[in-house]
Amino acid sequence: MLAIISPAKTLDFETPAPNFPFANSQPKLTAYSQQLIDICKQFSPAELGSLMSISDKLASLNVARFAEWQLEHNEQNSKAALFAFKGDVYTGLDAETLTQAQVEYVQVHLRMLSGLYGLLKPLDLMQPYRLEMGTKLVNPKGKDLYAFWGDIITQHLQTAMDEQGDNILVNLASDEYYGAVKPQKLQATIIKPVFLDEKNGKFKQISFYAKKARGMMVRFILETQPTSVEQLKAFNYGSYWFDEDASGATELVFKREEQA
């Protein structure tokens, strides 16, 4: 089983990553990343702010990040993606409390989609950046990052699935990032968990809760190591429960009553 998640805008490069007795891995697609960096380096803070719809302060920060980005990734300029990304999904995952065995498992069974890096293993080193997949960054391959990445992410996902031994792909990514995957080109059974919270008597997807629940589902996968879709239905973290009637063959719906 392989799960995919989105990255996070919020990063933490100040806190040291947990110390495990195995090496971090190298991101595989940095030659492509370098092409994007070269394009992004041409923008002024004002131009980058307009492109990304971010504040002047964030635009200046990311102009500096693009200028400082290096093709070589090492312990001095980089941090493992699993511990560098912060945000609602990663709060639910709570990577800092993983055991060594769980980190080794998640390295095989989880991938993060990325606008700059394409696809990351949890222990792949990454440098600070902001480049969301939905950014309309004109490049030699087209008008945006979906055109730039083309089939590359899908091909590497297929390789990851082949290496870990079955064809179940659990899509825990946002629509923005999953748009970079071409499911019709994957030899996979793609499962999409959906998390609904009750509000005013109705169940709906609430972004903050849904993101955190995606992270909790990753945590559930690495703690229980399921090998079938049926076993995924046992997910009950955060008081969610599986709703058989609302679910389909490939969409698993989990609900949670309104919190008192």
From Swiss-Prot:
Top-level taxon: Bacteria
InterPro entries (alphabetical): YaaA
Cellular component GO terms, alphabetical: cytosol
Entry's Gene Ontology BP terms: response to hydroperoxide
Family: Belongs to the UPF0246 family.
Protein name as annotated: UPF0246 protein APP7_0648
Species this protein is from: Actinobacillus pleuropneumoniae serotype 7 (strain AP76)
